[in-house]
């Protein structure tokens, strides 16, 4: 089957994890790619597009994506321009009108809760990532070569494993989902067992009785375990 433009990043991520010395969740690689692309987009020319500014003014950004925007070493002017209009929008929406006794602050609390839960980058990434999950399931169902690539994966993080199962259950025929679940679960069972052993060995290495023993795969087991439990890219830990 000829490769489509929307399958290219998925195949590249699943290839990269097989080539990497460090086990990684391919879906975490895809999410990180989407985040970086979106950050580059909104701190570039898209920042001045009216429809983009309307959304960034309204939604703002979460702390993680603020940190990604300011941590790239580029000019902070695009960020400042977005902040200028976002702060003005926030002031107008939350602090204009009403009195101190208007619901005893309940309305402001509701608005603040909505703002806190919103992020322009998160909403864009989540939408694109949801489509990518659907494509992963489509490739599993229709392409034998991708199915082999999937079965060769070393791990998925727990949050993405949950999403994979939900997407598979919603989109695959019942019999095929059973196979998908079995393969995915085998990958996870093998990795969590190995990871648990690596973390245990890391702990043992702080016992003087194990001083002369090699580290094996335990040196990076703590960040790997955190990324497995919460999501993250292992191969970027030391960059």
What are these language model-derived features?
Residues 1-239:
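Intrinsically disordered, low-complexity regulatory regions of eukaryotic proteins
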């Amino acid at each position: 089957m000829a490769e489509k433009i929307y399958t290219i990043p998925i195949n590249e991520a699943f290839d990269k994890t097989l080539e990497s010395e460090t086990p990684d969740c391919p879906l975490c690689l895809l999410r990180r790619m989407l985040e970086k692309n979106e950050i580059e987009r909104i701190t570039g020319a898209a920042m001045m597009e009216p429809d983009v500014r309307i959304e960034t003014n309204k939604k703002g950004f979460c702390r993680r994506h603020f940190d990604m925007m300011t941590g790239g070493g580029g000019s902070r002017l695009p960020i400042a321009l977005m902040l200028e209009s976002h702060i003005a929008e926030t002031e107008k929406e939350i602090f204009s009108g009403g009195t101190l006794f208007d619901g005893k602050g309940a309305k402001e609390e509701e608005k603040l809760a909505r703002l806190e839960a919103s992020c322009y980058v998160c909403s864009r990434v989540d939408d694109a990532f949801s489509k990518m999950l659907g494509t992963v399931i489509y490739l599993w169902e229709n392409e034998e070569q991708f199915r082999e690539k999937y079965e060769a994966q070393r791990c998925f993080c727990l949050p993405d494993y949950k999403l994979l199962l939900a997407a598979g259950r919603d989109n695959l025929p019942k019999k095929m989902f059973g196979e998908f679940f079995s393969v995915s679960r085998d990958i996870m069972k093998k990795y969590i067992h190995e990871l648990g052993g690596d973390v245990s060995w890391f702990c043992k290495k702080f016992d003087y009785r194990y001083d002369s023993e090699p580290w094996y795969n335990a040196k990076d087991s703590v960040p790997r375990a955190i990324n497995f439990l919460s999501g993250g890219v292992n191969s970027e830990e030391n960059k």
